[in-house]
Amino acid sequence: MPPLPATYRLQHPKRSVWSRLGLWGLHSLCVLLLGLPILTQAQRQDPLQSQTQTQTQTSTKQSTQEVQSQQQDKKAQNAAAEQDAPPTPTVAPARAISLAPHITEILFAAGAQDHLIAVDSSSDYPPAAKDLPRVGDALRVNPERLLELKPDQVWAWQANQIGPELQRQLEQTHISLIFAAPEKLDDIPAFIRLAGDSLDTADVAVPIAALLDNQIAALRQNSRLGKTVSVFLEIGSEPLYTLARDPLIQDVLSTCQAQNIYARHAAVAPTISLEDVLHKHPQVVITAYRDPAQLRARHLFWEKHLGLSPHALLNLNPDALYRPGPRLIEATRELCEQLDRYRAQVS
């Protein structure tokens, strides 16, 4: 900054206090002097404001205490109401009766075994089913015994197993009647799901049904490229009869790329002649015998009359093959594997 001119310094050799304060100092002093009355007035009003603030704080504190008290009273009232309220009634598990072996197996697979209170006389699988009371067989049901057990659900195979009179009684007593007659492999997991839904065991039934669905799909996928094989399914030997137009057996055979030589027969389980079988000359004979001696005799019979080699004579568990329950899917897998071995032998 350049020095001040000499004339300026000479003209003001001595300045008073006011000149030293300058305009800014004079302004600050005025503000200070003018503000004293305001400050004094504000100080005079402090007691009133303090009293008001105290009253406000007291009022707020009282309001908070009142709200807290009301909340505590409400909690106490709710607790008292909960104590005085009657207990929630528990719903008794549904009670079910099975009138067919495959239905018993379906209900067990669905996790509903604890709901079963009785079964038919042929239900022997799983082994625990043998311990349940009996209410008749596949053809005759004891109505008095069935109604005496007071079931919520009755699972039957077909309507003629029940009869119109018992159906009427079940309807009058509000007992549900459910028919379970699978006509294809996919129906088996579907009935397992139904059992899970109706008996509240879906947590078990749904994953089991999904597993069976996947197994069926895998069987169809694996067998679809196999060459079709003609088969004769021997159900009984004296007289000789077979399964023809049974839709479930047809689905089992088609899943394994097998063709029933009696698929076009008018009857479901016709009696047939040996001559007719010889005329149709199947590539494979499928039997289902438990007794080893009987099985050996039947295989020798077909070796003699049809000239079939041992690998063309197949045998399966009769209960697994002829009961439309979960084990039929495993029997289908075994049949597909045996047919694949036959194809490998003749290719």
Question: Which residues make up each language-model segment?
Answer:
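A ligand-binding cleft/hinge motif common to bilobed small-molecule-binding domains
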Residues: Q161-Q172, V284-H305
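Bacterial Sec-exported substrate-binding components of ABC uptake systems
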Residues: P2-T104, T201-F232, H281, E334-S347
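Extracytoplasmic substrate-binding proteins
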Residues: T90-R95, Q153, Q158, P164-Y241, ...
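His/Asp/Glu-enriched short active-site or ligand-binding loop at hydrolase and phosphoryl-transfer sites
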Residues: D120, D246-A269, Y289, A312-N315
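Short helices/loops that flank or line small-molecule/ion binding pockets
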Residues: P143-K150, T173, I272-H281
